[in-house]
């Protein structure tokens, strides 16, 4: 009898300790799995969407800063008070300046004749006539100056004077091309409508909302670890319940055995 009592007591303590160990073990695994799942979900939600937004903003900011920092002088020169002049007026101004310079040279070359005429003595009423050699040299210089003025006149003036008339013609020629470009778009409009409807129908078929739970989404996404964690949690809870029932039954039998044999 004493041997049975001692054995029953030993068995009781063994099962109690085993139950405590199992409960602590499974509870720890349950807590760890739940904690890991919460961490994974928080990491999945906190992941930023990978796209071209960040790179585009970085590139545009770098380009703007590089442009403003590399050429501050060019930005300062582009003020509204000094508008940029077109190319054709610049050519006309250069031609006028050359003509004015040549005209001034011609007048300055002719002035010595007048000075020679004015340098006559006032007491005498006669005017000294210039020599024939002076006349010939003056005529030759005038002819050379006229030839220089003719040779220095660029042909751009004629092109500039004709260019305003050519621009309306080009505008008129561009108008039919615009009409031609509009007409194919109008012709291709029904085809685009048909293809758009077709694509819309396929999109409506494929884009129906699917009623799936979070666990199914995680399993379909390929997160096998999450699926395994969820199933392991369920298995652990069921194992804990079964072990608790088994320990309760054994403890009850031991209590009854003590009561009977004592």
From Swiss-Prot:
Compositionally biased region (Low complexity): 67-111
Disulfide bonds: 219-227
Sequence segments annotated as region (Disordered): 44-223
UniProt topology in membrane: Lipid-anchor; GPI-anchor
Coiled coil: none
Signal sequence bounds: 1-20
GO biological process, any: cell adhesion
Domain of life: Eukaryota
Glycosylation sites: 22, 36, 139, 211, 235-236
Annotated Gene Ontology cellular component terms: plasma membrane; side of membrane
Biased composition (Gly residues): 51-66
Lipid attachment in record (GPI-anchor amidated asparagine): 236
One Pfam family, short name: MSA_2
Annotated keywords: Cell membrane, Disulfide bond, Glycoprotein, GPI-anchor, Lipoprotein, Malaria, Membrane, Merozoite, Signal
Entries under InterPro entries matching the protein: MSA2
Record protein name field: Merozoite surface protein 2
Native species: Plasmodium falciparum (isolate Camp / Malaysia)
Organismal lineage: Eukaryota, Sar, Alveolata, Apicomplexa, Aconoidasida
Gene: MSP2
